[in-house]
Amino acid sequence: MNMFSKVFGTRSQREVKRIMPLVKKIEDLRPEMQKLTDEELRGKTREFKKRLEEGATLDDLLPEAFATVREAAKRVLGMEHFEVQLIGGIVLHQGRIAEMKTGEGKTLVATLPSYLNALEGKGVHVVTVNDYLAKRDADEMGQVHRFLGLTVGVVLNDMKPEERREAYNCDITYVTNNELGFDYLRDNMVIYKEQLVQRDLHYCIIDEVDSILIDEARTPLIISGQSGKSTKLYEVCDILAQQLERGEASHEMTKIAAIMGEEVIETGDFVVNEKDKIVNLTEQGVKKVEKFFSIENLADPENLEIQHNIILALRAHNLMHRDQDYVVKDDEVMIVDEFTGRIMPGRRYSDGLHQAIEAKEHVKVKRESKTLATITFQNFFNKYDKKGGMTGTALTEEKEFRDIYAMDVVEIPTNKPVQRKDLDDAVYMTKKEKFNAVVQSVKEAHEKQQPVLVGTITIENSELISRMLKREGIPHNVLNAKFHELEAEIVAQAGQAGAVTIATNMAGRGTDIKLDDVSRAAGGLKIIGTERHESRRIDNQLRGRSGRQGDPGESRFYISLEDDLMRLFGSERLMKVFTSLGVAENEQIEHKMLSNAIEKAQEKIEFNNFGIRKNLLDYDQVNNEQREIIYKERRQVLDGENMRDAIYKMITDIVDNAVDMCFSEDVDSEEWDLNEFNSVLRQIIPIEPLTAEKVKGKKKNEMKHLIKEEAVKLYEAKESEFPEPEQLRELERVILLKSIDSKWMDHIDDMEILRQGIGLTAYGQRDPVVEYKMAAFDMFNSMITSIQEDTVRMLYHVHVEQKIEREQVAKVTGTNKDDSSVRKPVQRKEIKVYPNDPCPCGSGKKYKQCCGRKTANV
């Protein structure tokens, strides 16, 4: 703590001091609230809404509204908010993050700002990390809101769109971050306004805010459909990958190294950078790939797919580990969530990595998915007018919260002082010695009936410790990837006397571990970490499971110099130091140098991960601006707006572009290339061909005016073919919607390919993000032009008797973060399928070439 903090207190302490007068006002209202009958207390909601209509602000209502919720919670749940919980509620209402230690009642805190902000009638979202917590909190805390006359909904993974719509229309909705994000994306893929499920994003309270906005922010949300590409190349590249030899690089090729002209000396066929999770082919490796595929130059654009797939195969073999990153179950590769250690059914790695792993594991390779819609959590949550967050650990990432989300962190004091003892790390030379020490420590605690929670990073380690404990005859529970409903129950029982629980990472987070009298007397819950995590914050989360509400407890991490964290950040040097000191087997090492090395390694990885998230955001910021434009245009079409003027604008833009491309002011009209102009424009707008007589003596602008007049008259003639003008208006909406969706989905894929290839510009001393922005701008403009041309072309060639109905452009097959496969938005029933439509079976072929042919042959 620096001198300023010692004299004036930390920033959090100063913020809490500022909030205290408000807390006193709430406390002073307590006797008044206690006198009210249930009916009078409920009537406060109507009173507050009326005052808002009359011009009062939420801040004006805060003391009384909070006092109302406090009294309601006491009557309904038998729980009254502590002073520190009132402080937390105020911080959340202000759109900040309240750091509250485990067991301080964060769930109850959320009832205060959610009630106050729900009074505006725009909806409040309380966001949690899993369905179990969303349902539990909606059931328990929802009682308080219902008592006060508000409606409460919950959105769960298996709900149908109509159930979701009903839940989102409630005053307060409990929902997971994944469901919330995917519903937003799905809403921007629906074909009828009535299919929308969400309202505008007004205010949200994010529980476990660090987990959602930081840990999960490295991967964007992706909704995917099936691509038509063959899977053969994955299997071929897998065979080649196993023949290539792994080498080493003399040093990393950084941007600075490239600028300075430093040469990187590489051995073998490929090198692996485990820190950044990157694989690169060496010059020798490139030659082997070219020879294997009988191609001249791997870098040629037509060989991009081979290059991409061989890198994927090498990543699958060298960076993706079975029983750590994924498991193979029932002939299927299933992802393991790196933050909870749970299997995620229905979730697949995108961009072909999942297929590469399937080829590696010799299971059936499924077709690659095509991205239909995507968004990062950073950009999604920044769409809210206001957001607040709660967690037990946020201060270490305060800079990121402030820079990316414009949220600052306020540390809320605990209701009772923390009694937990956090012991120094126990460090051993090898993993074997470390695990022996862990088992010995569990054994000692178990003998005196002290409950133990052992935290592991991988499934493999949890199963290893389980086997070792079985050999010692110590009964225990294991919580890893096999998610089941009993998980929360097992975690809740982890504080009972003699209980031993092994949990992968933070399974069961959000569930309180309560002690009984025997375990309290034995020293409280003992936390054993079997490895330091990449992030100090996640280590602190594990520690925070013990010592809730002033309970006793202790925590200690057991580390070996063979652990991944140490191995990646130079433990060879430390290994040599301690070998020379002659450390005996099973002897614990204690040295200042070790503590520093561990902290430095974590800081490096945290900085690295921040870089990954920042990089993702820099690129997605470009996508976000484009996404906003497309989604706004789409919503106008869905809202049933009259698109006639927009279509006329498209027609005139197309004429302008064609004239500008083919005619020049600098040459006489006799020299204009009329053939080129006719072929460019007439395939879109079927005007009469331009002849030399028509253009003779005319200026370029004159021609623009004449052609526009003719094009507009032609469109008016098309309008007159329809008995009802609204028929053509609906056709305009249908065709425009189809064109937007089709082009936007292709554009998402093109942008991803661009992003992957743009990194090479760093070697040319150019900023990749700037290059990406420039290229993305050009690509977006091309896409807009393409949408306009497609729409106008179809409208000029449509016939009155043609029946064109709205339909989804692509079939949704899954998402990358859902707990199960994704639901397709409800479609109108009995949609007629026409010969040139995509076949409903999802084959990607036209109906007439697929099921339509079978039907015709019957």
Model regions: which residues?
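Conserved P-loop NTPase motor core
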Residues: M1-G582, Y631-K632, D653
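Small disulfide-bonded, cysteine-rich extracellular recognition modules and tandem repeats
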Residues: T10, G842-G844, R853-K854
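Short alpha-helical segment immediately N-terminal to, or the first helix within
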Residues: V91, C839-P840
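Extended, charged helical/alpha-beta scaffold domains that provide interaction surfaces
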Residues: Y326-M334, T340-R347, Q549-G550, F557, ...
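Short, Lys/Glu-rich amphipathic helical modules
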Residues: Q449-S462, D639-E641, A692-K696, P840
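Hydrophobic, well-ordered secondary-structure elements that form the walls
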Residues: V454, I502, W744, F780, ...
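Short metal-coordination and nucleic-acid-contact micro-motifs, chiefly zinc-binding Cys/His arrays
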Residues: Y834-D837, S843-K846
